[in-house]
UniProtKB/Swiss-Prot annotation:
Location in or out of the cell: Cytoplasm
UniProt GO molecular function: DNA binding; excinuclease ABC activity
Transmembrane regions listed in the UniProt entry: none
Domain of life: Bacteria
Protein name: UvrABC system protein C
Organism lineage string: Bacteria, Pseudomonadati, Dictyoglomota, Dictyoglomia, Dictyoglomales
HAMAP family from the UniProt entry: UvrC (MF_00203)
Gene3D superfamilies the record matches: 5' to 3' exonuclease, C-terminal subdomain (1.10.150.20), GIY-YIG endonuclease (3.40.1440.10), UVR domain (4.10.860.10), UvrC, RNAse H endonuclease domain (3.30.420.340)
UniProt keyword annotation of Nucleotidyltransferase present: no
Function: The UvrABC repair system catalyzes the recognition and processing of DNA lesions. UvrC both incises the 5' and 3' sides of the lesion. The N-terminal half is responsible for the 3' incision and the C-terminal half is responsible for the 5' incision.
Coiled-coil segments on the chain, per record: none
UniProt domain GIY-YIG: residue ranges: 19-95
Example GO BP: nucleotide-excision repair
Length: 599
């Protein structure tokens, strides 16, 4: 039932609203924002809620206690302000991108004299070029790494050319940077590289390959075979990337196709990125829907929130037509892009098929999400947790009789690994006899030092049994920190040990909760073992390279970066060694003779 007293009071207030363009906000009895809307005519639009008997209007008026408004100069400004306020207040009656603040982007700092490609989480009108948003920060970091390898764009934080280092960094010596800090490349040459990076991020791989092929031919003509070989490797990398992408259009159009999957008050949106006629990427986003949400609202809200940051293509295809707001959205998109943007529904069979394929992708993704939800719900029920355990950390120790001891931390968010939050710990404590408990305690102490910036997870999982659990609890008691929840998972019988219980918990082998815990435990073990092997390999390599005249710490780093293991270095031919940037012909011969001299 609607409270007629409050409704009449609100209506009287709205009668005095201006007939201007702007944004209106409904508040509930506690002062919390429940809905944000925009209007060409504020007075007319907000009064319509009182004359409308739709479920949405009834729901808003039932909850509302107060209404406020902001006047804007244009409808496009109202659209932008509405988006800003939805992100700020996250009202229950608006469509929202879940965890919107967390979505990372690629940022090409074109305002700098020597631009860099970096990860950003906030769009700013600073002259940079933004790409995204992406759903995984790992994808962003992989792209940055690939750009370094192919284009040798700088990655340092020096404010060039005002401040710069005295000598080039390791990236120069391993061939991942042209060292503009040392003037080894002109500004004009560097900006040619930047243009190549833009083409790469725009998906113009064939154009880049053609240019690189011409360069390779030129080097070969001039008998500069080492340089030609490096260009050849870059071409192969780009060809491999291009081959993985599916050709979906032969007109080389740049467009995004958007599809939705709605279930209860949740939805998923999928964006297919098509560049130069190839499907180069798909991005899936989770949306929170209000209790009552129309198709128009869903499409409009997602398009606005998604394209208020990151890149905008020439064409955006949505699954169905929507309201008169389409005109304002187009104006907003054109203004943000700085050129014409077409916002439309599918026009041909090719686009219809792609939207059908997108719907299948979303259905599969929804089934996966359901399995994760079952696992998290089961964990919450079994361990009597107050909230769904959306964040889980896993810990393990790896060593060989106490030597090269390391610890690992892996992080799972909503049932999936988030590798940017993985951490490796080189154990500082070196007892006479190996002691896994003391090593584990050191790792946990170091993790808890950063608890303000890095809050505790919902579940902390330890690879081990009752002894490991007790060792970890000792550290929490010592530091007077209250854990959310800790458990230890022993490998042999998959026994789960928890605080305050002497007997282990045994889950059935088909339990979704057990499968998730095993995944976290095994990933922590894998990560620890890989780091342990890396340290052992480095120590072994260093012990050999120390004996070779002319190979110091810097060259050791270069060789480790190039060959990873001692075995790979031993197998390397003299030509392979000569190709490594920073390794002269003379040093390459010394290294080769050290490993191959049979005399």
């Amino acid at each position: 039932m609607r409270n007629d007293f409050f409704i009449m009071d609100l209506k009287q207030k709205v009668e005095n609203f201006p007939e201007s363009t702007g944004v209106y906000i409904f508040y509930d009895h506690s002062g919390k924002v429940i809905y944000v809307g925009k209007a060409k005519n504020l007075r007319k639009r907000v009064l319509s809620y009182f004359n409308d008997d739709s479920p949405k209007s009834n729901y808003i008026l039932k909850k509302a206690k107060n209404i406020e408004f902001y006047i804007t100069d244009t409808e496009t400004e109202a659209l932008i302000l509405e988006s800003v306020l939805i992100k700020k207040y996250r009202p229950i009656m608006n469509v929202q991108l879940r965890d919107d603040k967390q979505y990372p982007m690629l940022k090409l700092t074109l305002y700098e004299e020597y631009p860099r490609l970096v990860l950003a989480r906030r769009f700013e009108d600073d002259g940079a070029r933004y790409y995204g948003p992406y759903t995984q920060s790992g994808t962003v970091r992989e792209t940055i790494s690939m750009v370094k390898k192919i284009f040798n764009l700088r990655s340092c934080n020096w404010n060039l050319p005002k401040s710069k280092p005295k000598r080039p960094c390791l990236n120069y010596f391993i061939g991942n940077c042209k060292a503009p800090c040392q003037n080894y490349i002109t500004k004009e040459e560097y900006w040619e590289i930047v243009k190549g990076v833009i083409d790469f991020l725009d998906g113009k791989y064939e154009e880049i390959i053609e240019k690189l092929y011409d360069q390779m031919q030129e080097y070969s003509k001039n008998l500069e075979f080492e340089k030609a070989a490096k260009i050849r490797d870059k071409i192969r990398l780009l060809q491999n990337l291009s081959e993985k992408q599916k050709i979906v259009s032969f007109n080389r159009e740049n467009k995004d196709l958007i599809q939705f999957y709605v279930e209860d008050h949740k939805a998923k949106a999928l964006v297919y990125l098509i560049r130069e006629g190839k499907l180069i990427e798909k991005r899936i986003f989770n949306l929170t829907l209000p209790e009552i949400c129309s198709n128009d609202e869903l499409i409009e809200s997602f398009v606005l929130q998604y394209y208020s940051r990151g890149e905008i293509p020439e064409v955006i295809v949505v699954p169905s037509p929507f309201s008169e707001e389409e005109v304002n959205l187009k104006e907003f998109l054109c203004k943000r892009k700085g050129s014409e943007v077409v916002l439309r529904t599918p026009e041909n069979e090719e686009e219809e098929k792609l939207l059908g394929m997108a719907l299948k992708d979303l259905t599969i993704e929804s089934i996966k999400s359901e399995k994760v939800w079952l696992a998290l719900s089961e964990l919450q029920r079994i361990f009597n947790l107050q909230n769904l355990p959306v964040s889980i950390e896993g810990y393990d120790i790896s060593n060989l009789q106490g030597r090269e001891a390391v610890g690992s931390r892996v992080y799972f968010q909503n049932g999936y690994p988030e590798k940017t939050k993985y951490r490796r710990y080189k154990i500082k404590y070196t007892p006479e006899l190996p002691n896994d408990y003391l090593m584990l305690q050191e790792v946990i102490r170091r993790r808890l030092k950063n608890i303000e910036e890095d809050p505790l997870p919902d579940i902390m999982l330890i690879d081990g049994g009752k002894g490991q659990l007790s060792a970890v609890l000792e550290v929490f008691n010592e530091l007077k920190i209250e854990p959310k929840f800790i458990l230890a998972l022993a490998k042999e019988k998959e026994e789960i040990f928890v605080p305050g219980r002497s007997e282990p918990i045994l889950l059935s082998y088909d339990s979704p909760a057990l499968h998730l815990l095993q995944q976290v435990r095994d990933e922590a073990h894998r990560f620890a073992v890989s780091y342990h092997r890396k340290l052992r390999s480095k120590k072994l390599m260093d012990s050999h390279l120390d004996k070779i005249p002319g190979v110091g710490e810097k060259r050791m780093k270069i060789l480790l970066e190039a060959f990873s293991t001692l075995e790979n270095l031993k197998k390397a031919s003299l030509e392979d060694l000569k190709k490594v940037p920073g390794i002269s012909e003379k040093i390459a011969e010394k290294i080769y003779l050290y490993f191959h001299d049979s005399s």
